[in-house]
Amino acid sequence: MKIIIINTNCSNLSSVKIMLNKLGCNTIITDDPDLIIQSDKILLPGVGTANTAMKQLKKKNLIQLIKKCTQPTLGICLGMQLFGSFSNENTHTNTLNIINVPVKHMYSPTLPIPHMGWNNITILKKHDLLNGINNNHYFYFAHSYCMELNYTTIAYTNYGQPFSSVIVYKNFFGVQFHPEKSSFSGEQLIKNFLEI
């Protein structure tokens, strides 16, 4: 199986690769369009700002390629947010518009933003991506922006407000948390993705 991590020049690429290697996967970090097209699975991790990530994808001529991918593609944290229509970060940043849902800054009158640390998910719809995972499983989050619950949401998390923590749309899968930092639960989710 050919597994590609799209090189967005973000800081968590190597930690995602380490987890995949631990699971016995042959994984390449690349921005080569030919390698991406020929892959069996794609991961789009991201840390930082939507504006910076979109500039990188545009510079590498990857925007249309990602949108046209037919193989299973997993967006992690910012990578999931990039699947949305736009982010209100820096007033307005256009993203990949794979799903017609905006990404908005989180708000809580009592909790600190960004949302940092462990939190559980509440599953709304059964899906192969969540096999072996239930509402008691905790994942590691680190984000200030989120997607509200929408037609692609299969699990959500509460942090001052409910937000989408797992989404599925066609061949695109997204998780707001970091599976590579989420111990057993994260490893189980990645295994499930690899089996889809």
Curated annotation (Swiss-Prot):
GO terms for biological process: L-histidine biosynthetic process. Residues 2-196 form the Glutamine amidotransferase type-1 domain. This is Imidazole glycerol phosphate synthase subunit HisH. SUPFAM superfamilies: Class I glutamine amidotransferase-like. CDD domains: GATase1_IGP_Synthase. Pathway: Amino-acid biosynthesis; L-histidine biosynthesis; L-histidine from 5-phospho-alpha-D-ribose 1-diphosphate: step 5/9. It catalyses: 5-[(5-phospho-1-deoxy-D-ribulos-1-ylimino)methylamino]-1-(5-phospho-beta-D-ribosyl)imidazole-4-carboxamide + L-glutamine = D-erythro-1-(imidazol-4-yl)glycerol 3-phosphate + 5-amino-1-(5-phospho-beta-D-ribosyl)imidazole-4-carboxamide + L-glutamate + H(+); L-glutamine + H2O = L-glutamate + NH4(+). The active site is at C77 (nucleophile), H178, E180. Heterodimer of HisH and HisF. GO terms for molecular function: glutaminase activity; imidazoleglycerol-phosphate synthase activity; lyase activity. It is found in: Cytoplasm. HAMAP family: HisH. Keywords: Amino-acid biosynthesis, Cytoplasm, Glutamine amidotransferase, Histidine biosynthesis, Hydrolase, Lyase. Its EC number is 4.3.2.10, 3.5.1.2. The lineage of its organism: Bacteria, Pseudomonadati, Pseudomonadota, Gammaproteobacteria, Enterobacterales.
